[in-house]
Amino acid sequence: MGLSVIILAAGQGKRMASSTPKILHPLGGIPLLERVVNTARLLNPHTIQVVYGNGGSHVREKLNYLPVHWIEQSQPLGTGHAVLQAIPFCQNEDRVLILYGDVPLISPKTLNSLLENTPSNGLGVVVAELPDPTGLGRIIRDDFGNILSIVEHKDAAEHQLKIREINTGIMTTTAMNLKKWLPQLNNNNCQKEYYLTDTVALAVAEGCPVGCVAAQCCEEVQGVNDRWELTKLERYYQRLMAKKLSLAGVTIIDPERFDARGENIEIAPDVVIDVNVILEGNVQLDRNVRIGPNVILKNTTVGENTEIHANSVIEAAVIKANCSVGPFARLRPGSVLEEGAKVGNFVEMKKTTLGRGSKANHLTYLGDTIIGKNVNVGAGTITCNYDGANKWQTKIEDGAFIGSNVALVAPLTVGKNATIGAGSTLSQDAPPDQLTVARERQRTIKGWHRPTKKE
C-alpha cells in the first residue's frame, strides 16, 4: 500500500482582501502551499496532488518548481468535490492523506501518528479542542466516545455548537473508500457544497472503523483565512524558531523582534543575535558570530568570530572568519570578505572580493573589484565600473594603499604595494611599489575676493 497525498488549495481566500491567491502568501518567507508540500514530502508519498482553483495558472506559474501533480477545480463546489477531482489519479490500494494548503504548520509527527493509528481499511481524522470553535466543524460522538459524524458550524444545532472538539479537515482513508463514498455526497446543506466531512457518517453507516488523533497544539492545525490570522501564525512560528535556536546555544536578545524567513538557516552555538534581525533564505552563521541590531542577512555565510554591526544589509555574500562589517554597510550579491577583512560604515560592495586583512572603512563603493591582501581603501574611494553599456573590473594587488577620495576608472590594475594619492582619478594602471597621483596641482589665486550680494 502506497501513500498518496491530496492537498486542497482551491479556496478563494476573499477575506485576505488581496489580488494574490491566499496560498501564495508567505509564512516565514515561504508560501503557505509550499510549506504544506514540504511537510508532505517528509512522509515519502509516491505522489502529491494539489487541487487548485482561485488564482489558476498564477499559482502553478509561481510554484512550478514543486514536485506535485496539479489538478484544477474549475467550480468551487466544496471539499468533497475537490477530492473527487483528484481521486481518479490514486490507485485503489493507496492510503490517501488529505491536507490543506492554508494549514501550513501541521507537523510530520502528527501526520505520522494519524497514519500509524488508522486501521488499514478505516478512516482517521485529526481533531483539536479549542476554547472558541466558532466557524469550525464539530466532532459528534456517541455515549461511548465513538465518532458518529462531523457537522459543519453553519449546519449545527444549538446544542452541537457547544461542542469544543473540532475537525481540522486533515483526514486519511483508502482510495477505494473515497471512490465509493464521494459519489454518494449531496449538497443539502446551508452552503450548498459537497462536504468531504460527510464521508465520516458514510463510513460509520458501513461499519468502517473511524478513529482520530489529537493535534499537539492548536497552532499546528490553524488555518489562514485573513491577514490577521496570518500575522498571529507568523509570530507563533518565529517564536518557535527563536526557541529552537536558543535551546541549541544561540542567544536571541528578544524573540519577539527576530525573523527567520527560510528553511535552511544554520546557526552554531555562541552566536549572539540582537533585536530586529532578519535572516532570509540560506543563512549560515559560525561560532561566536555577533549580529547587531537591524541587520538583514539573505543567502549569506558568516565565518566564526565575525561581527556584523548595526543596520547592515547583506545579500548573497561570503564573509569569512574574524571579519568586521558595518555599521550601515551594504554587501550585494557576489561580495566576498576573506579572513580578517573589514568593511566599515557606508561602504557598498558588489561582485567584489576584499582580501585577507584588507579594509575599506568609510564611504566607499567597490563594484566588480578584486582586492588582494592587506590593502587599505581610503574614505570616499569609488570604483567606476560601468561605462553606460558594460561593467569592467578593477584589480588592486596586495599591500596597496588607496588614499581618500580616489576614483578608479575600470578597467585598470593597481600594482602590489602601490600608493595612490588622495583625490586622484585613475584611468590607467598604477605600477607597483610607487606613488601615483592624478590630480591638478594646487593653486592660490592672489587678489581674489568673494562676490557680494546685491542690495
From Swiss-Prot:
Residues 249-455 are annotated as: N-acetyltransferase. It comes from the Bacteria. The keyword Chaperone does not apply. Pathway: Nucleotide-sugar biosynthesis; UDP-N-acetyl-alpha-D-glucosamine biosynthesis; N-acetyl-alpha-D-glucosamine 1-phosphate from alpha-D-glucosamine 6-phosphate (route II): step 2/2; Nucleotide-sugar biosynthesis; UDP-N-acetyl-alpha-D-glucosamine biosynthesis; UDP-N-acetyl-alpha-D-glucosamine from N-acetyl-alpha-D-glucosamine 1-phosphate: step 1/1; Bacterial outer membrane biogenesis; LPS lipid A biosynthesis. Mg(2+) binds at D102, N225. It is an enzyme of class 2 (transferase). Keywords: Acyltransferase, Cell shape, Cell wall biogenesis/degradation, Cytoplasm, Magnesium, Metal-binding, Multifunctional enzyme, Nucleotidyltransferase, Peptidoglycan synthesis, Repeat, Transferase. Its EC number is 2.7.7.23, 2.3.1.157. UDP-N-acetyl-alpha-D-glucosamine binds at residues 8-11, 22, 73, 78-79, 100-102, 137, 152, 167, 225, 332, 350, 365, 376. The active site is at H362. Homotrimer. This is Bifunctional protein GlmU. It comes from Coxiella burnetii (strain CbuG_Q212) (Coxiella burnetii (strain Q212)).
